UniProtKB/Swiss-Prot annotation:
Residue stretches of each PFTB repeat: 68-110, 417-459, 485-525, 533-582, 591-634
EC number: 4.2.1.129, 5.4.99.17
Protein name per the record: Squalene-hopene cyclase
Active site residues of this protein: D396
Organism: Schizosaccharomyces japonicus (strain yFS275 / FY16936)
Site (Transition state stabilizer): W324, W506
A Gene Ontology molecular function term of the record: lyase activity
Applied relevance: The fast anaerobic growth of Schizosaccharomyces japonicus in sterol-free media is an interesting trait for developing robust fungal cell factories for application in anaerobic industrial processes.
Superkingdom in the source lineage: Eukaryota
Keyword Cytoplasm on entry: no
Keyword presence, Lyase: yes
Cellular component aspect of the GO annotation: lipid droplet
Keywords: Isomerase, Lyase, Repeat
């Protein structure tokens, strides 16, 4: 049921109805726990990843006909009926890179290019300039298939692997996702292999200008004058590569493989994300490594582990999110069982015991990851996002998982909490904030090189991640950590937007950032009448929709108004309500309207519906849809409101 936005919304909340909603949501979430105690939900990205998987199968001639037809069904469904291209998030504008890759993949699967949807897609691609305006990763695909020469890709010599940490363009100054992607890609770009392409499929019809006539493939965006400088250097330096001594070239190859192979990470794959795994598959084939070699075979298994295969459709995820899903699900269930009137206390204890056991087993305690380049004496103690990614734990997952273990309040969690606390403190950047995976990963000039047209080569501190770290440290309550917390709060104050919100680097967007920071401020003792808090509260109230909910589009990463969308969404409504309650506004009509919206939009099965994307990988380029968000965040918000209403308090007692 949707409320008429032109009418005054009734904010009367029936406690009986609230009780029923919370219990139904609890059951829906509890049933999804896996046998070993963890939760895992689908993590959908845009069409580029499934399209690239089809292209990878044809690059290597490892074609699964049934699978690729299911992926083709998915690609057809995701095609826009407005602009007939493919967006990079639900309901988004035409995107040239996604559209070129999806069209190419569909043609690979045998799609008739004269079918109406293919004709319209082709017309849209041509109207936007064709593949020469696509991003770097699309142009790499084109080069592999011979649709364009390797001159269409940025110059990335494998000798980059030899650069020491103190040199700006060292891989150690890149983000983890860039570092793991670049290492195999450097070898691929050097060897310039050609896809097997057994069906001999090509896409000349997409090029308004023949590829060999294109004068420049580097179109920006140029974020500073350095972008133009690096474009010139890219062209000027290429002829000199033949003068690189062969011994140095071989040494660079060895350095690349010495980096990659210890991090192959078994069936979880290099970096536990799709791009490094896919380039590793191409790299091993180009190096002449047989497919049955354990390195190549296991890497292929890791890639297949990202597939979501259903009856009619299939798609490939960019990665999986079990640690994140488990910690967030645990928080929601514990909130529902909190207090003397909590529901299912005994059952929840058993569910959380199993989740905590699983989390403790997945804490990274013995592997010194890449993060140590900036703090070599720091002892490991974090969690990764995926099942296994020991070289790359992140502070966000670590904070949320540790807060769950702390809330459980059992002796067996003490060592895990101590290791997590010390690791997070050691990961604080010099400006007081936290990046997700690295310390001081903020050499912005790197985002000006031609390879970084996505603008996400780095992992600088962000407000949302920093807020979670502050929340954990405040919750743990060690007096000696107060200077660390204060530096973090100072960083957050500097990062506040003019309208009172905070940027959401990993969740969409300013509503997510606002919720994250308000929770951290509350946990760390920032008064509810602090000017920063009041300004953020006013922001959240100003963007509440007439139906009582909140919604925000991924367009906000591209410059549109903060906190605005065409519909209210369960996850974002929950974030806004949680943020307002953390600022002492439990009795505010805005909170009540949000709670009413969540109650009214719950489905009969205890779940909520949410199709739009709710998170981001790389702003302006790559967005995500966490299918678990629509479940655990509404339950967390409703359960918290229920407890606060029953106890008559306006103070949130927990940090998350």
């Amino acid at each position: 049921m949707k409320t008429d936005g032109n009418t005054t919304l009734d904010t009367t909340i029936s406690m009986e109805e609230l009780e029923r909603t919370v219990k139904s949501a609890y059951e829906a979430l509890a049933k999804d726990q896996q046998d070993d105690g963890h939760w895992i939900y689908e993590l959908e990205a845009d069409v580029t990843i499934p399209a690239q998987f089809i292209l990878l199968e044809h690059t290597l001639d490892k074609i699964d006909e049934e699978l690729e037809q299911k992926i083709a069904n998915y690609l057809r469904r995701c095609q826009s009926r407005e602009h007939w291209g493919w967006p990079v998030y639900y309901g988004g504008e035409f995107n040239i890179s996604a559209s070129v890759q999806a069209y190419f993949a569909l043609k690979m699967t045998g799609e008739d290019i004269n079918a109406p949807h293919m004709v319209r897609a082709r017309e849209a691609i041509l109207a936007h300039g064709g593949p020469e305006y696509a991003n770097v990763f699309t142009r790499i695909q084109l080069s592999l298939f011979g649709e364009a020469s390797w001159l269409a890709t940025p110059f990335m010599p494998v000798e980059i692997m030899l650069l020491p940490r103190w040199m700006y363009f060292s891989i150690w100054n890149m983000s983890y996702w860039s570092r793991t992607t670049v290492a195999p890609l450097l070898i691929v770009a050097d060897l310039k292999p050609k896809a097997i392409n057994p069906r001999n499929v090509h896409i000349p019809e997409l090029f308004p200008t023949p590829p060999d006539k294109v004068k420049t493939w580097i179109h920006g965006p140029f974020r500073s004058k350095w972008g133009h400088v690096f474009k010139f250097i890219d062209t000027a330096i290429r002829p000199f590569t033949r003068f690189v001594p062969s011994f140095l070239h071989k040494k660079a190859y060895k350095a690349a493989l010495d980096f990659i192979e210890p991090r192959l990470n078994g069936v979880d794959g290099l970096g536990a994300i799709y791009p490094p795994m896919s380039y590793s598959a191409v790299m091993y084939r180009a190096l002449g490594i047989p497919d049955d070699d354990p390195r190549a075979a296991t890497n292929w298994e890791a890639l297949k582990g990202l597939l979501v295969i259903k009856e009619r459709e299939a798609y490939c995820q960019a990665c999986v999110s079990p640690v994140w899903d488990t910690a967030l699900s645990g928080h929601a269930l514990m909130e529902a069982s909190f207090g003397p009137d909590g529901i299912n206390a005994d059952r929840t204890e058993k569910l959380i015991d199993r989740a905590a056991h699983w989390l403790r087993a997945h804490q990274v305690l013995n592997v010194v990851g890449d993060w140590a380049i900036n703090n070599p004496n720091l002892q490991p103690g974090g969690w990764a996002f995926q099942y296994g990614n020991d070289y790359y734990p992140d502070v966000d997952d670590t904070a949320v998982a540790a807060m769950l273990l702390h809330r459980q309040n059992l002796p067996e969690n003490e060592e895990a909490l101590d290791r997590a606390r010390k690791w997070i403190i050691g990961m604080q950047s010099s400006n007081g904030g936290w990046g997700a995976f690295d310390i001081d990963n903020d050499k912005q000039i790197l985002n000006d090189i031609p390879f970084a047209d996505h603008g996400a080569l780095l992992d600088p501190p962000t407000a949302d991640v920093s807020a979670r770290c502050i929340s954990l440290l405040a919750e743990l309550g060690h007096p000696e950590d107060r200077p660390v917390i204060e530096r973090g709060i100072k960083y957050l104050r500097k990062e506040q937007e003019e309208d009172g919100s905070w940027f959401g680097r990993w969740g969409t967007n300013y509503i997510y950032g606002a919720w994250s920071v308000l929770c951290a401020f509350n946990a760390s003792g920032v008064p509810h009448d602090d000017p920063s808090v009041l300004k953020c509260v006013n922001f959240l109230k100003s963007v509440q929709r007439e139906d009582g909910g909140w919604g925000e589009s991924c367009e906000t990463y591209e410059g549109s108004a903060h906190g605005v969308y065409t519909e209210s969404l369960p996850s974002q409504t929950a974030w806004a309500v949680l943020g307002l309650m953390a600022s002492g506004r439990r009795t505010d009509p805005a909170v009540k309207r949000g709670i009413v919206w969540l109650i009214q939009h719950q489905q009969d099965n205890g779940e909520w519906a949410e199709e739009p994307f709710n998170a981001v990988g790389f702003p302006r380029m790559f967005y995500l849809h966490y299918l678990g968000y629509k479940q655990f965040f509404p339950l967390l918000a409703l359960a918290r409101y229920r407890h606060m209403e029953k106890s008559g308090t306006n103070n949130v007692s927990f940090a998350f």
